[in-house]
Amino acid sequence: MNEKQRLEQTGQIKTESHPADRKSALDRLKEKTTKDYEKYFTSVFLPPNLKEAKKRGKEEVKYVKDFSIPEEFRGMGRGRKFYIRTYGCQMNEHDTEVMAGIFMALGYEPTDRPEEANVILLNTCAIRENAENKVFGELGYLKPLKTTNPDLLLGVCGCMSQEESVVKKILKQYQYVDLIFGTHNIHRLPYILHEAYMSKEMVVEVWSKEGDVVENLPKVRKGKIKAWVNIMYGCDKFCTYCIVPYTRGKERSRRPEDIIQEVRQLAAQGYKEITLLGQNVNAYGKDFTDIQYGLGDLMDELRKIDIARIRFTTSHPRDFDDRLIEVLAKRGNLVEHIHLPVQSGSTEILKMMGRKYTREEYLELVRKIKAAIPDVALTTDIIVGFPNETDEQFEETLSLYREVEFDSAYTFIYSPREGTPAANMKDNVPMEVKKERLKRLNDLVQEIAAKKMKQYEGQVVEVLVEGESKTNPDVLAGYTRKNKLVHFVGPKSLIGQLVNVRITQAKTWTLTGELVNEAIEVNEHGKIYAG
């Protein structure tokens, strides 16, 4: 949806009100019918709708390549500061980089102190209830700031904003929030801020259906060593427990030439590692109608670029094809680490989850990957306590984990998400049982992780040095190609460089070693050698 279409759809009408006469957005909704409520907001009120979000439109996704800050908004932030708190996944981290870029293009300055900010945004995650509770707690914590500084703009954005229940709760319980916007219209941040400054009411703009693919958005990247690169948006899998297809929209792929150009620019700027992002990253290109081009093809082109490491996340087993495996086996700057969420080891539970693969199909995929990349590091996600999960089905998860021998796993107790099919399933697994299963799984995860890490002792590994250790400023920290955290003593000048480290001690989640030689360099052919 472009700006013209948005205005045509909404028929935006603005009214002014005296602060003393203000009524909450929820009060106005109760007073007026659904048909005419829009005109009672200074800005157009577009709440999310889960039913609309599930519809996958046939209209062509528009590619907007000419994003720019409107002249009338330049200087809006002069003398003002912004603060963004980010919850959740790497996609949210990247969205924050984009919003920070827009803020700074508007003239705002960043601050890491909420009490100094003129605009505070909470970029939220909806994947689990615990993540949402943290955001509501933070909103309560920020209320005194809003009370003492009425001119402060307080906003909620990200995935939680795409949920009907969340927006209704904010309208009812957190009426001091000034603006709510979702994941599809980040590029409209200048307009939303302008409306919030001009209005006397809460600004709510959440598109239930996906927006355009907007290129050339400004970004303020975190650091100069590693960078996120979005290659696609949305997910069409609709796993029964997952809210993401509703909050992020249908699958939309960026054009390969735009991605390749961005990666080349990052390489020219000196970045050492990029991570390709997508909710279902290996579905990349399946929405193209004019070319046959998938993630394997993209990776095959990116591996020729002079950058040390390329990763991707998160992949779905169903879309992990032979072409991608073939390209990853070429290695070079394509790392030997794959995150491959399995969620359960039981075919029956996988069917209830709507994962669209069986235990046997997942194990066959793992066999293919290991045959092509024998030293690959596989990590995964697992949910325990899914509705109706039996002891036998949980044991199947444990046995699959033992068979694959994952390097590590993100493990969770099932968290029902309102609006998803699984939320309507009868949950007959007691919480005590869920917790006991999680403990048993985590014990196994740690056992296998410790065994795999022990194998590194005496080995020399390539480490990308990211900075000082969080616990000791005299120690440097970085990650291997397989995403293992390594600590070693060395000069600060090595930060941002690739070095060789001999591992002297292995713990469950970290490695300790000693510097072997100077920084590793990457030549013009993308080949790595020790200097």
Curated annotation (Swiss-Prot):
It comes from the Bacteria. Its EC number is 2.8.4.3. Catalyzes the methylthiolation of N6-(dimethylallyl)adenosine (i(6)A), leading to the formation of 2-methylthio-N6-(dimethylallyl)adenosine (ms(2)i(6)A) at position 37 in tRNAs that read codons beginning with uridine. Monomer. GO terms for cellular component: cytosol. The keyword Iron-sulfur applies. Binds 2 [4Fe-4S] clusters. One cluster is coordinated with 3 cysteines and an exchangeable S-adenosyl-L-methionine. This is tRNA-2-methylthio-N(6)-dimethylallyladenosine synthase. HAMAP family: tRNA_metthiotr_MiaB (MF_01864). Keywords: 4Fe-4S, Cytoplasm, Iron, Iron-sulfur, Metal-binding, S-adenosyl-L-methionine, Transferase, tRNA processing. It holds the Pfam family Radical_SAM. Belongs to the methylthiotransferase family. MiaB subfamily. Its main location: cytoplasm. The gene is miaB. Residues 15-26 have a biased composition (Basic and acidic residues). It catalyses: N(6)-dimethylallyladenosine(37) in tRNA + (sulfur carrier)-SH + AH2 + 2 S-adenosyl-L-methionine = 2-methylsulfanyl-N(6)-dimethylallyladenosine(37) in tRNA + (sulfur carrier)-H + 5'-deoxyadenosine + L-methionine + A + S-adenosyl-L-homocysteine + 2 H(+). Residues 1-26 are annotated as: Disordered. Residues 80-198 form the MTTase N-terminal domain. [4Fe-4S] cluster 2 binds at residues 235, 239, 242. SMART domains: Elp3. [4Fe-4S] cluster 1 binds at residues 89, 125, 159. Residues 221-451 form the Radical SAM core domain. It comes from Geobacillus kaustophilus (strain HTA426).
